């Protein structure tokens, strides 16, 4: 299928909320090997975020049921098997995205904005793997996630305005990584607060095109800070990450 046709089909699939189809189309576009435009990059990101998002929330629900089920309950094995099925799907999706990132996207990125976008994506998908990993595998996955986020973070600080939505989105997700994966609320709050304060200080540099995106992510940073510094800090913080652009 021609690239233009694949993109048209991906947009149609998005409107129909058929994200698996959308992801298949954008995977095919990526595998053609050319650098993606901003629009194509966003289509790819939205597709896989929805595809993996369904599995992440399903995994959480099933895990919660599993933990509450008595060990003597005959249903426990069925629940465990189902969790492992969802886990397997989630791993497969993450592996596909990480392969696309390493083979095509990061290597082809010619500007800092794209590089940060893809490295952030790499951090995200290793983070999703870390959510379901255990033992040595989990440690390696966490290291991979942190390494990608840190590389993206260093480039973003050097090359992008503090109000840039990609830089803000990276700070949002990196802080969620510190809070949820490394269980380090102090570092999570420091990172989120610094990103928020730096953006506030330079509000006059806000690009009109990205005003809505930037202010939305700033609001999410503030919501997470409120949540993390309150006594009720808990599972729901990742909902903020889910609403990120």
UniProtKB/Swiss-Prot annotation:
Positions carrying Phosphoserine: 92, 232
GO terms for biological process, alphabetical: negative regulation of DNA-templated transcription; negative regulation of monoatomic ion transmembrane transport; protein localization; protein targeting; signal transduction; small GTPase-mediated signal transduction; substantia nigra development
Key words, A-Z: Acetylation, Cytoplasm, Isopeptide bond, Nitration, Phosphoprotein, Ubl conjugation
Main location: cytoplasm
Subcellular location: Cytoplasm
Cross-link (Glycyl lysine isopeptide (Lys-Gly) (interchain with G-Cter in SUMO2)): 49
Tissue note: Abundantly expressed in brain, heart and pancreas, and at lower levels in kidney and placenta. Up-regulated in the lumbar spinal cord from patients with sporadic amyotrophic lateral sclerosis (ALS) compared with controls, with highest levels of expression in individuals with predominant lower motor neuron involvement.
Residue(s) carrying N-acetylmethionine: 1
InterPro entries: 14-3-3, 14-3-3_CS, 14-3-3_dom_sf, 14-3-3_domain, 14-3-3_theta
GO terms for MF: 14-3-3 protein binding; identical protein binding; protein domain specific binding; transmembrane transporter binding
GO cellular component, one term: cytosol
Positions of modified residues (N6-acetyllysine): 3, 49, 68, 115
Record note on modification: Ser-232 is probably phosphorylated by CK1.
SMART domains: 14_3_3
PROSITE patterns linked to this entry: 1433_1, 1433_2
A Pfam family that the UniProt record links to this protein: 14-3-3
Residues with the 3'-nitrotyrosine modification: 82, 104
Residues with site note (Interaction with phosphoserine on interacting protein): 56, 127
Function: Adapter protein implicated in the regulation of a large spectrum of both general and specialized signaling pathways. Binds to a large number of partners, usually by recognition of a phosphoserine or phosphothreonine motif. Binding generally results in the modulation of the activity of the binding partner. Negatively regulates the kinase activity of PDPK1.
Subunit structure: Homodimer. Interacts with CDK16. Interacts with RGS7 (phosphorylated form). Interacts with SSH1. Interacts with CDKN1B ('Thr-198' phosphorylated form); the interaction translocates CDKN1B to the cytoplasm. Interacts with GAB2. Interacts with the 'Ser-241' phosphorylated form of PDPK1. Interacts with the 'Thr-369' phosphorylated form of DAPK2. Interacts with PI4KB, TBC1D22A and TBC1D22B. Interacts with SLITRK1. Interacts with RIPOR2 isoform 2.
Protein family per UniProt: Belongs to the 14-3-3 family.
Protein name: 14-3-3 protein theta
């Amino acid at each position: 299928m021609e690239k233009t046709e694949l993109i048209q089909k991906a947009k149609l699939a998005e409107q129909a909320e058929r994200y698996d189809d959308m992801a298949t189309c954008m995977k095919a576009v990526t595998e053609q090997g050319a650098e993606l435009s901003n629009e194509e990059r966003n289509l790819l990101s939205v597709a896989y975020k929805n595809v993996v998002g369904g599995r992440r929330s399903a995994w959480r629900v099933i895990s919660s049921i599993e933990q509450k089920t008595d060990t003597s309950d005959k249903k426990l094995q069925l629940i465990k098997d189902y969790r492992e099925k969802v886990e397997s799907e989630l791993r497969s999706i993450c592996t596909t995205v990480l392969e696309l990132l390493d083979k095509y996207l990061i290597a082809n990125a010619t500007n800092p904005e794209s590089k940060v976008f893809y490295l952030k994506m790499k951090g995200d998908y290793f983070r999703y793997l870390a959510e379901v990993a255990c033992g040595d595998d989990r440690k390696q996955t966490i290291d991979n996630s942190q390494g990608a986020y840190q590389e993206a973070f260093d480039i973003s600080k050097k090359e992008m305005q503090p109000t840039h939505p990609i830089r803000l989105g990276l700070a949002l997700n990196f802080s969620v990584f510190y809070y949820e994966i490394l269980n380090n609320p102090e570092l999570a709050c420091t990172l989120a607060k610094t990103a928020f304060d730096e953006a506030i200080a330079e509000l006059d540099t806000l690009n009109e095109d990205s005003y809505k995106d930037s202010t939305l992510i700033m609001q999410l940073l503030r919501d997470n800070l409120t949540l993390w510094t309150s006594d009720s800090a808990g599972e729901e913080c990742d909902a903020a990450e889910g609403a990120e652009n």
